[in-house]
């Protein structure tokens, strides 16, 4: 299943977002990041072994990230901290089987998992979105395990 999963890590800034979107627009698997629902993790390295993270899902990663960087910084201080930090990055996770329900379940599982990680001092998104059955629900465990393997090997 590995070729179905796409994870990109970019610096958390408008400039890097725009550069990445241009690259994804011409890549073979870019549609899984730009035109499919995605899950994303924004992390900020506070010290050598201390991170704060935000886990989200969206149907439009470009516009959602712009909202976080431009408008949300005026509403919640942690968004300003993420945007001003030179150590913030964002993992964008796409998959050809992602639909809204599956991304909500992946987001929920990632929040639960990251809350248990010793080096993560804060997970800022605390809403839960557990879904009932849906078309690809039987793939949740396998896709989540693959994401965790790739994310933890890169983080």
Label each region the model flagged:
Residues 4-26:
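N-terminal, Lys/Arg-enriched amphipathic/low-complexity engagement segments
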Residues 30-36, 46-48:
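A short catalytic or substrate-binding loop motif that flags glycine-/basic-rich loops and adjacent residues
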Residues 40-42, 51-59:
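GIY-YIG nuclease signature motif recognition
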Residues 53, 94-102, 132-135, 139:
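Conserved aromatic-histidine-acidic binding/catalytic patches
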Residues 102-128, 135:
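Domain-level recognition of nuclease-like catalytic cores that cleave nucleotide substrates
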Residues 137-150:
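Long, charge-rich alpha-helical interaction segments
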């Amino acid at each position: 299943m590995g070729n179905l999963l796409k994870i990109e890590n970019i610096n958390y800034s408008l400039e890097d977002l725009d550069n990445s979107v241009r690259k994804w627009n011409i890549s073979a698997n870019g549609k899984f990041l730009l035109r499919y629902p995605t899950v994303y993790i924004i992390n900020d390295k506070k010290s050598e072994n201390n991170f704060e993270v935000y886990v989200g899902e969206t149907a439009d990663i470009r516009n959602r990230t712009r909202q976080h960087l431009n408008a949300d910084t005026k509403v919640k201080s942690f968004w300003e901290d993420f945007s001003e930090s030179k150590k913030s990055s964002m993992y964008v996770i796409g998959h050809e089987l992602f639909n809204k329900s599956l991304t909500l379940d992946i987001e929920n599982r990632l929040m639960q998992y990251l809350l248990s990680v010793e080096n993560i001092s804060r997970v800022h998104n605390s809403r839960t979105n557990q879904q009932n059955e849906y078309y690809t629900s039987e793939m949740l465990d396998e896709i989540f395990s693959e994401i965790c393997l790739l994310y933890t090997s890169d983080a």
